[in-house]
Amino acid sequence: MKNKKLLTMVLAAAMVVGSITVPAPMATVKADTVTTSRTNILREDGVVVSQQHGSARSLIDGDITTVWDTNGWNGSQAGFPGSGKHNYSVWAEFTLADYYNVSDFNVWFKDETTQKNTAWQYKIEASIDNSNWDLVVDQTENTVTDKHFENIVGKDYKNKIYKYVKVSIVGAKTDMKPWPAMTEFAAYGERATAL
């Protein structure tokens, strides 16, 4: 009987310990740099943008004080002022360091007076061939005004292999007149073992 109680207690403890999940470390903003224990899988020399005013390399330099922004406010006014909705069509496309199963992304938007209280609307797509794109993160109806977003890839795409990633700013919900601008973009995942 004593052994049965001991076995029951050991099994119960094992079940509790086995059910505890520890969240993976996510990139966080600290001061003027991006701090993470994970490696951004975007290649430094593999970024192409639709247009730029600030350097496209600013998106992956780990410094949130550097900015990639567009050539000014070019959105559809959609009834501005007062409508609160602007449409954009700007993007940044990245080549991954290798073929990856991409798991998640971090996006940092510019934080200044004209961007305050702006809910940036964006989408993230991924491709293996740079021609056929999967919509892996859809924030095109976003109404949250944060400047940093952690995005988990949709379950239908977690096991797919990708070589290219594109983030597109498609809109903004605000009464301001902001230029589309991002300070940092990061992708995380596991290197694919086979194609």
Q: Can you describe what each PLM-predicted range is?
A:
Residues M1-V10:
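Bacterial Sec-dependent N-terminal signal peptides
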Residues V17-V34:
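Sec-dependent signal peptide cleavage junction
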Residues D32-T33, T66-W133, N151-L195:
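Aromatic, loop-rich ligand-recognition surfaces of beta-strand-rich domains
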Residues D32-T70:
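Predominantly extracellular/luminal regions of secreted and cell-surface proteins
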Residues L135-V144:
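Solvent-exposed serine/threonine-rich low-complexity stretches and specific carbohydrate-binding patches
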